[in-house]
C-alpha cells in the first residue's frame, strides 16, 4: 500500500518502513503500528494427540476454554482445534470454584493419538492463534474481530500517509 506514496525499506526485524520527505531538514515524525497478536506456542503433543501450549502475550485463562484456535505449522498449513480441559463432571467441588489453570488446558484437534497430530505437521514451536471471524455486530458501526488495537495503528499510519500532501516534515509510517 505504500508503493508510490513513500520510499519503502525493511529492517532486520521484518518491519516495513515508509518514508515521505517534505523538507529534508524538517522535523521527523513517526506513526507506528504493529501486526502481531497474542497467541500461543505448541510445547508438546500428548500420547492422546492433545496439544499442550504456552502463552505468547497476555491471556486471561477464564476466557480461553472452548475457544477455537488455529495452529500454523512451519510449512504454513493451518490446523483448527478447540481449547479443552478436564470435563466439569469429573472436577471436584473445590476445583469447580476456581478458574482452570492454563497448564491444565490443551488444544483438541479431533485426532486419536500423537501420531495423527504429527502427521498433520504439528511440532513444538508452531504458532497458535485465535480463530475469530471478523464481523459487524447488530449495530453495523461496531465490529468484532481479533487484534484490532494492533491493526488500527497500521491503518492510521497508512491513512496519514495517504492524506499527507504538502508538508515540512520527514514522515515515517512504520
Where are these regions (language model features)?
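N-terminal hydrophobic/helix-forming segments and targeting peptides
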Residues: 1-174
Amino acid at each position: 500500500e505504500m508503493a508510490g506514496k513513500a520510499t519503502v525499506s525493511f529492517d532486520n526485524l521484518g518491519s516495513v518502513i515508509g518514508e515521505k520527505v517534505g523538507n529534508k531538514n524538517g522535523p521527523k515524525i513517526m506513526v507506528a503500528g504493529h501486526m502481531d497478536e497474542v497467541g500461543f506456542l505448541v510445547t508438546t503433543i500428548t500420547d492422546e494427540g492433545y496439544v499442550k501450549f504456552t502463552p505468547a502475550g497476555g491471556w486471561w485463562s477464564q476466557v480461553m476454554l472452548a475457544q477455537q484456535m488455529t495452529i500454523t505449522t512451519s510449512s504454513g498449513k493451518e490446523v483448527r482445534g478447540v481449547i479443552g480441559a478436564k470435563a466439569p463432571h469429573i472436577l471436584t467441588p473445590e476445583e469447580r470454584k476456581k478458574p482452570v489453570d492454563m497448564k491444565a488446558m490443551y488444544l483438541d484437534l479431533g485426532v486419536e493419538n500423537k501420531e495423527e497430530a504429527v502427521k498433520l505437521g504439528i511440532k513444538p514451536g508452531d504458532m497458535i492463534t485465535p480463530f475469530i471471524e471478523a464481523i459487524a455486530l447488530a449495530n453495523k458501526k461496531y465490529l468484532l474481530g481479533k487484534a484490532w488495537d494492533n491493526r488500527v495503528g497500521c491503518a492510521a499510519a497508512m491513512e496519514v500517509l495517504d492524506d499527507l500532501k504538502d508538508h515540512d516534515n520527514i514522515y515515517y509510517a512504520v
